Swiss-Prot record:
Organism, as annotated: Saccharolobus islandicus (strain L.S.2.15 / Lassen #1)
Binding, sn-glycerol 3-phosphate: T16, R84, E85, Y135, D242
InterPro entries, alphabetized: ATPase_NBD, Carb_kinase_FGGY, Carb_kinase_FGGY_CS, FGGY_C, FGGY_N, Glycerol_kin
EC number, UniProt record: 2.7.1.30
Gene Ontology BP terms: glycerol catabolic process; glycerol metabolic process; glycerol-3-phosphate metabolic process
Protein name per UniProt: Glycerol kinase
Keywords attached to this entry: ATP-binding, Glycerol metabolism, Kinase, Nucleotide-binding, Transferase
Positions contributing to glycerol binding: R84, E85, Y135, D242, Q243
Length: 501
């Protein structure tokens, strides 16, 4: 094709294990993809770090590959999406990181967040929508300020910058001209008041974090600065955390629209509109903001183990050689044969929040085969998704009529049909499964006027397949009741047998 007349949007997707760059055309078709892995660093048990320089190098290699077939002058916008919460502090003058990036999985700051949980839980949940946990950026920033020599002193002199990885990449791409983040990423720091849409001074003072190190918080779609890294100036005009970008990429623009991303674990986000809803069992987060001082909010539920259970079936039990074999194996049986699998390898996430739960296979008889267990593993993903969606409906009072899906397991037709059956609602799989990158490409294109409205984006978005529920209500109720019983037996198990959390 003659690409010279085409306009393209470049999405940078900075993940936990690799940096990707995906080039989209103006009809949101994928033109090319670049992907490079970068090393994980584990200096001590519970510590997980990345070298920001290695991330930058991997990201630039990915960009080079993605744009190799076009002229960079045809790129009208760049959007950035990222692993959320991961924290970098760097020297404002030299641009050099003062310490490795502390990754969202890192647990070293548990003593800090245990103290916050014991003394300030309600205040933090009310203001930020989050629960005190090492997962979020605030305690990671405090740890670096307290433990890396001279950093606190430099921070107090205004010589240190903080950012999640979107902020760091924008800083690098603009040669230090822009120190910004968007509402969605700011809402994952545990320093941002999601009601007032500003950094919270009370929490900053509590953790002794100087406000001067924080980036300016802007809408998710506007020009933040211009990239100087590709030979010509290109506007950087979209920014969103990965899960929020996926919600946008699923065109979930209306209240009650919901998406599930099936990865190693799963993330379920629901658009709840312009007012934050307080939730007992879920996180309240900012989905995006398309204009200043106005945000769209989401409820978020995270499931710790979904796709990782298939990896365990493959590597731990050696029951299959490759992950793709699980669907045909599970298809060999009509149903689960009464077998339930609760994948509580590291406890249970939303809505149970039980770190003492442990994995369980129950209902085994002499007639149970490998295929029944394979089916039970797939079904556990659907049951856990229903667990979260039921809480979302109950706590929001919003009726959910369909579920949009993406991620690796969404390609599995057997699982997606069962997901529709056990929920009793339609499940919709999009044509383009790279919803995270597509979401931030949409935001970037909106920011420069390549697309003019959410309606225009919705009209471009395409469905691959819809799964319509065909199970009777009686069977649905019986199967889900069995799942709830199995979960009850898995909960608290590590306490019973004295296992480690």
């Amino acid at each position: 094709m003659n690409t010279m007349s085409h306009k393209f949007v470049l999405a940078l997707d900075e993940g936990t294990t690799s940096a990707r760059a995906i080039l989209f055309d103006s009809d949101l078709n994928i033109v090319n993809i670049g992907q490079y892995e970068f090393p994980q660093h584990y200096p001590q048990p519970g510590y997980v770090e990345h070298d920001p320089e290695e991330i930058w190098e991997a990201q630039m290699l990915a960009v080079k590959k993605a744009i190799s077939k076009i002229d960079a002058k045809q790129i009208v916008a760049i959007g950035i999406t990222n692993q959320r919460e991961t924290t970098v502090l760097w020297d404002a003058k030299s641009g050099k990181p003062v310490y490795n990036a502390i990754v969202w999985q890192d647990r070293r700051t548990s003593p800090i967040t245990d103290w916050l949980k014991a003394n300030y839980f309600k205040m933090i949940k009310d203001k930020t929508g989050l629960v005190p946990d090492p997962y979020f950026s605030a305690s990671k920033i405090k740890w670096i300020l307290d433990n890396v020599p001279n950093v606190r002193e430099k921070a107090e002199r205004g010589e240190i910058k903080f950012g999640t990885l979107d902020t760091y990449l924008i800083w690098r791409l603009t040669n230090g001209k822009a120190h910004v983040t968007d509402y969605s990423n700011a809402s994952r720091t545990m320093l941002f008041n999601i009601n007032k849409l500003e950094c919270d001074r009370e929490i900053l003072e509590l953790l002794k974090i100087p406000e001067s190190i924080l980036p300016e918080v802007k809408p998710s779609s506007e020009i933040y600065g211009y990239s100087e890294a590709l030979g010509n100036l290109i506007p950087i005009s979209g920014d969103a955390g990965d899960q929020q970008a996926a919600l946008f990429g699923q065109v979930a623009f209306n209240v009650g629209e919901i998406k599930a991303t099936y990865g190693t674990g799963s993330f379920i986000l629901m658009n709840i509109g312009n007012n934050p809803i307080r939730s007992e069992n879920l996180l309240t987060t900012i989905a995006w903001g398309l204009e200043k001082n106005k945000a769209t909010y989401a409820l978020e539920g995270s499931i710790f183990i979904t796709g990782a259970a298939v990896q365990w079936f493959r590597d731990g039990l050696r029951a299959i050689d490759v992950s793709d074999e699980i669907e045909p194996l599970a298809s060999n049986v009509e149903d689960n044969g009464g077998v339930y699998f609760v994948p509580a390898f590291v406890g249970l996430g939303a809505p149970y929040w039980d770190p003492y739960a442990r994995g369980l296979i129950i209902g085994i008889t002499r007639g149970t085969t490998k295929a029944h267990i394979a089916r039970a593993i797939l079904e556990s993903m659907a049951y856990q998704t229903r667990d979260v969606i039921e809480v979302m409906q109950k706590e929001s009072g919003i009726s959910i009529n369909s579920l949009k899906v993406d991620g690796g397991a969404a390609k599995d037709n057997l699982l997606m049909q069962f997901q529709a059956d056990i929920l009793g609602i339609k499940v919709i799989r999009p044509k383009v499964m790279e919803t995270t990158s597509m979401g931030v490409a949409m935001l970037a294109g909106l920011g420069v006027g390549l697309w003019n409205s959410l309606e225009e984006l919705r009209s471009i978005w395409k469905v691959d397949k819809e799964f319509i529920p065909s199970m009777s209500e009686e069977k649905r109720r019986a199967l889900y009741s069995g799942w709830k019983e199995a979960v009850k037996r898995a909960m608290g198990w590590a306490k019973v047998v004295g296992g480690q959390v």
